[in-house]
Amino acid sequence: VISPKSFDPLRTRETFVIAMADATAALLVPPLLDRLQRDAPNATLRLRPLTTRDPLPLLENDELHLAVGHFPGAVADMILREMQEDRPDTFGHQEIYEGQYVCVMREGHPLGEAPVSLDDYCAARHLLVSYSGRPFGFVDEALATRQRTRRIVLTLNQFFTAANVVAQSDLLTILPLDFIPATGLAERLVWQPVPVALPAMRVDMVWH
């Protein structure tokens, strides 16, 4: 990673490689490009899809300059290292914003008129957004603490595609609330609180 002492943003021609999910990119990339054009006009960005909740190995191997996303385990590990003086940490992190996940479905869905009960949620058919392709997510982990499960009939790795699919089907999905306007489908979607407690959706940037 570039040393701050030698870095001149106005002169750099660096290509910065950043990993983030499409929902995060929809919110952050437009203002980031404006800032880059003003402060580092010769630099370029290369975005990679986010495929993991632990970007530290990719950063350590210099495959990325920066990762942006919800990394609770990785950030907790970095905080632990920072507290242990004999374990100097070569990673840095900063919270960008804290968001909220909601249960999203098409306009006119039978479950869209009121908050969804846990029983109705578990009985419904679901679309899972999974960066890594694994067939379960943090919602399923939260349900497991209540000895409950849900039926996932489709797994994919793009929030934009998820919004498009649920707008045309009876599937439910989980989306970041702040992302819904960026889909261009807000008028075709409705959303309700997720009927199981979830951790805060903290979005951090992490670097090496």
Task: Give short role names for the model-derived ranges.
Residues 87-99, 114:
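A structural signal for short loop-to-beta-strand junctions that line the ligand-binding cleft
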Residues 1-19, 37-38, 88-93:
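Short helix-loop hinge/linker segments at domain boundaries
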Residues 13-81, 156:
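Central regulatory/effector-binding core of bacterial HTH transcription factors
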Residues 59-60, 121, 164-169, 205:
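Hydrophobic residues within well-ordered alpha-helices
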Residues 71-86, 141, 145, 159-189:
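A ligand-binding cleft/hinge motif common to bilobed small-molecule-binding domains
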Residues 70, 105, 111-118, 122-146:
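Secondary-structure junction motif
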Residues 28, 107, 112-113, 118, ...:
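A late-sequence structural motif
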Residues 15-19, 67, 104, 127, ...:
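Short, well-ordered beta-strand segments
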